[in-house]
Amino acid sequence: MNKPINLLVGGLTLFAAQGCKAPKQASQQAEHPNIIYVFPDQYRNQAMGFWRQDGFRDKVNFEGDPVHTPNLDAFARESMVLSSAQSNCPLSSPHRGMLLTGMYPNKSGVPLNCNSTRPISSLREDAECIGDVFSKAGYDCAYFGKLHADFPTPNDPEHPGQYVEEKRPAWDAYTPKERRHGFNYWYSYGTFDEHKNPHYWDTDGKRHDPKEWSPLHESGKVISYLKNDGNVRDTKKPFFIM
């Protein structure tokens, strides 16, 4: 088995897994590794226990928080950890706009947090996003969890002409297929911060209300995708997950 390559960057994680393959497949996989990009919602870099441990604390100019994060610590020990990666706009929507497009907020179309009173803030439809790039490179692309990069419109797939939530301004949003920028598998929502009572729209626009803590539920969905339960991805292709 080729050793997986893990990249841990502050509050985000990039995981490139190669796995067990025949020689020809291994060569192809080395050129197109499977990639899992994990990023939480505005996670504080200092709030990871390994920054207080030997081999890490002397690499940064801050003191890590006194937190207990054994799983992240173990992951860091198996990873390449970048000590100086940062966002120049660490705000929900603008950061996601930059992450997806590689552009500053004044160019990505997302200068502000997206809600129904801010039509000026929505991910540019003509932008080439990271999902577009990986899709064109032959990847099966999947997006899980919060997006919060679209201007909410009355496009509820189950109730045409209505927003997906009643409160105003509307913050949550449904992202139709034509705005998913290369992600062919979808299990996402706009923004809805009731993490013990989450909801999601799948690839076909069906809403799911799992009644489960969102990090646990989303992890389970990612694992299901990796196992290819229900034949949801093309196993002949490498995968890219966000």
Task: List PLM regions with ranges.
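Formylglycine-dependent sulfatase
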Residues: 3-4, 11-12, 20-242
